[in-house]
Amino acid sequence: MSFFVNRIWYGNHFLQWILVPFSWLYRIVIRTRRWYLQRFCQQLYPIPIIVVGNVTVGGVGKTPLVIEIAKKIQQKGLKVGIVSRGYKAAIKHFPYEVKLNDSAELVGDEPLMMARKINCPVVIAPKRNEAVRYLLDKHSVEIIISDDGLQHYKMGRSIEIVVIDGMRKLGNGFCLPAGPLREPDSRLKQVDFVIVNQGAAEGTYSMELIPKNIVRLSTQEEVSNDLFTSEVAAVAGIGNPQRFYSTLSQLGIKFNPYSYPDHHQFKPHDLNDIDLPVIMTEKDAVKCYSFSSDKLYYLPVEAKLNDSFWEAFWSHQQLQGYY
């Protein structure tokens, strides 16, 4: 996201007021669209569909939460599957089940990362209903998680979980284009759970992204933070790189930031000219395996939520009888 857009959406730039009339028009359009799709086009399913999404543009930390929820479901002995749009995937035939040896360019960075971190089927399709039907037909899953897709109202859902960035929150509170909201903040009152990533607010649940040991990309060995006593290059192609940089600072690692657009497809030339050890996010690392070297590292993170969330989650009426 450009610095200029950030100033409008997350600051007090005068241009937001010029764009407000267009935001009201946008609200009318999306409200009408939602009503129509839910009433005439939504497909319901015989098993729980859990949607993990957001109401803002940009990264909020959904994917680590999807991974954690999938693991918790597996710990209950249940068969889980994940559906994703497969943003920027080069493949053209859908639905497609992600394979561990696929490239991020072929299937998308987030689906590939999820497939490698969880022993469950991950299926991509721009039309998510196609991915859901594939999982039901091919894998007989008992619960499906949709990574993003809150606004994909053709897909029925049993539970809606919205993630909010604790640093940027809802920005200036306006819908597109004056602000970062895909839907008005009143939408939060209609979902089942609101989770704040690295923060807290009344009526929400707090989530922390816990950094794990840094991993050398070429060998997959964990290394100590003590290895990085001098400056490194912090490379991030995610929606909110500041969160990644803040984590490195908390770990005591000195770095030069290198920010790229979200879902940037890294090429060797992006990193070869950097004359420093490179630490990147795990989401970015999956795009660099084909040209990994000893100077490339990544920092995995794990979503952690308190017991009160999990108690409320498993007590949800749509999950009764599933544990």
Swiss-Prot record:
Pathway: Glycolipid biosynthesis; lipid IV(A) biosynthesis; lipid IV(A) from (3R)-3-hydroxytetradecanoyl-[acyl-carrier-protein] and UDP-N-acetyl-alpha-D-glucosamine: step 6/6
Protein residues bound to ATP: 56-63
Reactions performed catalytically: a lipid A disaccharide + ATP = a lipid IVA + ADP + H(+)
Entry's Gene Ontology BP terms: lipid A biosynthetic process; lipopolysaccharide core region biosynthetic process
Keyword presence, Nucleotidyltransferase: no
Alphabetized UniProt keyword annotations: ATP-binding, Kinase, Lipid A biosynthesis, Lipid biosynthesis, Lipid metabolism, Nucleotide-binding, Transferase
InterPro entries, alphabetized: LpxK, P-loop_NTPase
Enzyme class (EC, first level): transferase
GO cellular component assignments: plasma membrane
EC number(s) given by UniProt: 2.7.1.130
Zinc-finger as UniProt keyword: no
GO MF, one annotated term: ATP binding
Function description: Transfers the gamma-phosphate of ATP to the 4'-position of a tetraacyldisaccharide 1-phosphate intermediate (termed DS-1-P) to form tetraacyldisaccharide 1,4'-bis-phosphate (lipid IVA).
Family recorded in the similarity comment: Belongs to the LpxK family.
Official protein name in the record: Tetraacyldisaccharide 4'-kinase
Source organism per UniProt: Legionella pneumophila subsp. pneumophila (strain Philadelphia 1 / ATCC 33152 / DSM 7513)
Gene that encodes the chain: lpxK
